[in-house]
Amino acid sequence: MEQNLDVNNIRQLVDIAIKVVYFVEDNVSESEVKDLLIKLINSPFDSYFIFKSLKKDVKCDLLLNNNIQSYADIGDKVEKNLQSLNSCIQSLSPNKFNNLKDGFLQKNFPSIFDSNKTKYKEVATKVREELSQLEFDFIRLKIDISKSNQFVDKNLTNVQNYLKAKGLYLHLLIKTWDVLSNNKLSQYVDSNLPQEFVENILYSVLDELKTCCEIIVSMHTSMKIYHQLRTRNDYFLKNIDNAINNAKTVFQQLKDMSSINDEKIAILNNLTQETNDSIQKISDEIKDFKQIKEQQPVVTE
């Protein structure tokens, strides 16, 4: 038995698994342990089916492999849209059109001033159209992320229920192992059994215990993946909300400036400052996003 199963390794797995299912109360009764022992003794070659019938597994419909990749590129889409928004805002700066707010240019070179003003209005119209599309794209991304979060929440619930069932089963196997490995069998059943027979039963219990622990550890890893994905998506939602708010602010500025005339040229002073503030805000958002993205790489299984 010890040549095929490393008992020390199993003990380590048990310690890890117990920590994972710490929330599962050990309420396995002595009668449950006795019932399992009797079944294994009476039908030693049917241990696989005995264990299978005892497992109280909740169906854990983990669609990780099928779905996680469809959400893995959301971060790249968010970053791409933020950069597009940043470019839109930067293109609105009057400084790119020989400073429309420059009174000297307006007074001494009115034709150049009017030409620059026309160019600015043309750019503003184009940017306004781009902002409308960007806002639509951001909203669509929010819908995708919301769907992703629903998927994550469902899987977290499934895994939690799955671990609860596995935790109860784990406690049963641990107690059965304790009985068989510490000469307590006589407290439950007829002890006049060949030692080799008892060792074979112990082997089957240890093998099942090892599998149970490995599954619990694997499910715990899945939970960490889901939590990571959820945290990442929440961060994306924050970035998208900020981006949409900035887009709406600039969009409103463009609406206000669509009827620009000489009397209202001073408004460009405020627009320039607000635009630069928006540029800085978006730049900071992109920088923060990249830092988070580096800390939380896309997870695959």
PLM regions: where:
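Alpha-helical scaffold segments that mediate packing/assembly in large oligomeric complexes
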Residues: 157, 161-185
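Aromatic-residue detector
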Residues: 70-72, 76, 165, 172-174, ...
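Long amphipathic all-alpha helical oligomerization modules
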Residues: 174, 178-301
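Leu/Val/Ala/Ile-rich N-terminal alpha-helices, chiefly Sec-type signal peptides and the beginnings
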Residues: 1-156, 160, 167
